[in-house]
Amino acid sequence: YARRYPDQQPADGQRIPALREVITLLKDRNKEAVELWREIKTSPEKPGSTSSPQEVAEAVVQLLKSEAATNPVRLLSFDWRALTYCLDTHSDMPLIFLSTAGGKTNNLQQGQPGASPWLAGVDIDDYGGSVPRAIQSLGGRFWGPYFKSLTSDQVQEAHGLGIQVFPWTVDDIDDMRRLIDMGVDCIITNRPDRLLALIKRR
């Protein structure tokens, strides 16, 4: 891990904070404008490892309500079942449909028979492999593609369908510059310092 992120400053003894702790920290520091992006990490390929995507999504939403979180919130997931549940029950919350066509989490499963278990019943091949069209069919408005596979044509297609594009996870300045030139709406990054510096220079 340290080799992958050599610039990261270690913090011995620190653990990943619970969502409630994050909300409390933002309240204590009067950071109501900071957006909370919460990824729902469930897998249809390992159904016994977590609660159902619907249960996890509902637990997150209820915690936000019980803590009276005033920060803008977005939920994102590779498991579109969590997002379609929220579309039905919490339609006012921005939902980002994550996608990737390779690696450990190939949630699109293009060219394979039937619907991908990740896509809430959608068979991506029914839409000619178009992720924006598949998201639109579910009522979604935000797409989070893996940045290396994103093309300008896909960005234009998504925008034509009223879908904003938020590629992940972009840490290299040249990649950031290329994606900004494509016209993406947001960039998900581990290095906001680099992205902000680039935006200021443009």
Predicted regions and their residues:
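Metal-dependent phosphodiesterase/phospholipase catalytic core, i.e.
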Residues: 1-102, 115-127, 136-146, 159-161
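C-terminal active-site rim and adjoining tail of enzyme catalytic domains
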Residues: 98-99, 105-202
